[in-house]
């Protein structure tokens, strides 16, 4: 295996990346290699998918499969090698179906039958050993000796950003929202990568194209979430348990949570959110369920201790699973793209087994003293008081805005974000999103003239809300986003964050501070380009970076 797609990748060798029997995320080499091969297979589907679309015979099920398959290869999503073997077989069958439709259309139209090469020609080996042999030649570092580390790193930037795009698009699709132009963009990016591009300018251009595509995808997901569950409202969320049977839901999928709330209504079971599910409490259609009891625990990297203490079953939706401990292995379930060997998997909102487990387990024996935090400051809530915010800026009551958000993780250096937020002066406002918020969301920030100093915008995909807030403020002040008293301090971990970063760059947003370390696939040569064109900076000392941000705006 060779993998350097996440922030926690091994950096102890001469070349950064996990290249042993097991990666730092817990992914074994077999699973890692099968994931590489699945990406290769999906490129073949996209090659024919792009042609099918121009012929007027698109295959919507194939397009949905591409999103799902790519999602399974994100960090901390699926560790189940057997499921990847099955997905590889399905990928070949899907590609052949799209290919056959293209050929049939060409023959009927009397035009040349398309003949494609590369991933479009791939056929799965008969057994696991054969599949692993195939995977050896299609990893992310394929061609390193020929094209060099910069080109391989840029290919990785495009691929990893695309993985994030596919994950967000899948979230929207399962809620019933999809768009042809998104599928077209995904196919185009995969087909581009299938050609093993080696031109720096073309790779950078495609990376920024993906950033623009991701903005469209995040807008669609925002429409999906608000269309299904209502507009986020500022809401107090209980973070201390109540007595009774309990289920914990982690991950990102609001549709799974809604289905579970419907199925547990009237059972006496309390449902709690964990990690990135916290913003669910701000959506009217979700918080209307009285047994959505609160949020339990912290960010994804705390799950082993959180889940071990939780007295009921756990449902993992979408990404962020890590190896289940023996203390809860028999009471954790996966759904959607998530998988772990030996863990029971539930499909299509089929939750009776999960509910029976909750009824059999003790639940919380007592109600703890109530503690709450506030969520729900999406763009509708913030822009609803935009006049008040603008007046506070003009009056000098608000000096600066900080967006401190993104993915959290366990690596050293992430306390930087806690220190930065807690040191922010009282005349500044901190906006946050993603699970990085757990670094400081219980700190008492107070308010400025009734405007909370901490505004929790939502999940990582709610970066769209943050962008809309920033552009609305820029319009109000008749300036560009880069001219606002606004600093972006971003914590990244995996491929969704890579997609969001590309979106920010595509919008021309400069001087982003990124950490706790820079992506391993961003080579010194590529970093020089990003610094020159976009002013990207690594994080340093929290106090010094804070002072620099305030000084730059004051100047």
UniProtKB/Swiss-Prot annotation:
Keywords for this protein: 4Fe-4S, Cytoplasm, Iron, Iron-sulfur, Metal-binding, Oxidoreductase
Residues binding hybrid [4Fe-2O-2S] cluster: 252, 276, 320, 407, 435, 460, 494, 496
A Pfam match: Prismane
The keyword Lyase is annotated on this UniProt entry: no
Modified residues (Cysteine persulfide): 407
Necessary cofactors: [4Fe-4S] cluster; hybrid [4Fe-2O-2S] cluster
GO CC annotation terms, alphabetical: cytoplasm
GO MF terms held by the record: 4 iron, 4 sulfur cluster binding; hydroxylamine reductase activity; metal ion binding; peroxidase activity
CDD domains in alphabetical order: HCP (cd01914)
Superkingdom of the organism of origin: Bacteria
Listed HAMAP family: Hydroxylam_reduct (MF_00069)
PANTHER family tied to this protein: HYDROXYLAMINE REDUCTASE
Family in the record: Belongs to the HCP family.
Family matches, as NCBIfam families: hybrid_clust, PRK05290.1
Protein name, per record: Hydroxylamine reductase
Species the sequence originates in: Burkholderia ambifaria (strain MC40-6)
Gene from which the chain derives: hcp
């Amino acid at each position: 295996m060779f993998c350097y797609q996440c922030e926690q990748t091994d950096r102890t060798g001469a070349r950064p990346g996990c290249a042993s029997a097991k990666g730092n995320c817990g992914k074994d080499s077999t699973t890692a290699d099968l994931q590489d091969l699945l990406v290769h297979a999906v490129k073949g589907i996209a090659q024919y998918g792009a042609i099918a679309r121009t012929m007027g015979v698109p295959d919507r099920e194939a397009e949905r499969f591409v999103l799902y398959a790519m999602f399974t290869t994100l960090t901390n999503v699926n560790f189940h090698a057997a499921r990847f073997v099955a997905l590889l077989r399905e990928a070949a069958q899907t590609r052949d179906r799209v290919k056959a439709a293209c050929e049939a259309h060409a023959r009927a139209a009397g035009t040349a039958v398309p003949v494609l090469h590369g991933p479009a020609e791939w056929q799965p080996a008969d057994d696991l050993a054969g599949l692993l042999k195939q995977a050896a030649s299609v990893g992310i570092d394929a061609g390193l000796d020929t094209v060099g580390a910069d080109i391989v790193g840029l290919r990785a930037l495009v691929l990893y950003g695309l993985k994030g795009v596919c994950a967000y698009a899948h979230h929207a699709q399962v809620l019933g929202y999809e768009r042809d132009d998104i599928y077209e963009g995904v196919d185009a990016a995969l087909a581009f990568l299938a050609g093993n591009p080696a031109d720096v300018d073309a790779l950078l251009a495609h990376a920024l194209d993906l950033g623009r595509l991701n903005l469209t995808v995040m807008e669609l997901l925002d429409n999906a979430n608000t269309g299904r569950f209502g507009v986020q409202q500022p809401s107090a969320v209980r973070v201390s348990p109540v007595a009774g049977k309990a289920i914990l839901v982690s991950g990102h999928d609001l549709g799974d949570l809604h289905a579970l709330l419907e199925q547990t209504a009237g059972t006496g079971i309390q449902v709690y959110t964990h990690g990135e599910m916290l913003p669910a409490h701000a959506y009217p259609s979700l918080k209307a369920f009285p047994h959505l009891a609160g949020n339990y625990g912290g960010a994804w990297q705390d799950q082993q201790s959180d889940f071990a203490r939780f007295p009921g079953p756990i449902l993992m939706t979408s990404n962020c699973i890590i190896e289940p401990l023996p203390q809860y292995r028999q009471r954790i379930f996966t759904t959607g793209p998530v998988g772990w060997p030996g863990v029971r998997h539930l499909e299509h909102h089929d939750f009776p087994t999960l509910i029976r487990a909750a009824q059999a387990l003790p639940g919380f024996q007592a109600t703890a003293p109530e503690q709450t935090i506030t969520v729900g400051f999406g763009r509708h809530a913030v822009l609803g008081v935009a006049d008040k915010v603008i007046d506070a800026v003009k009056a000098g009551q608000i000096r600066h805005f900080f967006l401190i958000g993104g993915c959290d993780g366990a690596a050293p250096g992430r306390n930087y974000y806690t220190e930065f937020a807690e040191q922010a002066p009282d005349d500044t406002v901190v906006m946050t999103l993603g699970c990085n918020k757990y670094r400081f969301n219980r700190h008492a920030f107070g308010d400025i003239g009734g405007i909370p100093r901490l505004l929790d915008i939502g999940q990582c995909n709610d970066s769209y809300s943050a962008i809309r807030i920033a552009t609305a403020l820029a319009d109000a002040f008749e300036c560009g986003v880069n001219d606002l008293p606004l600093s972006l301090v971003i914590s990244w971990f995996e491929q969704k964050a890579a997609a969001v970063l590309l979106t920010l760059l595509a919008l021309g947003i400069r001087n982003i501070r990124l950490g706790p370390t820079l992506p391993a696939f961003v080579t010194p040569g590529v970093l020089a380009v990003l610094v020159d064109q976009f002013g990207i900076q690594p994080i340093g000392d929290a106090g010094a970076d804070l002072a620099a941000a305030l000084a730059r705006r004051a100047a």
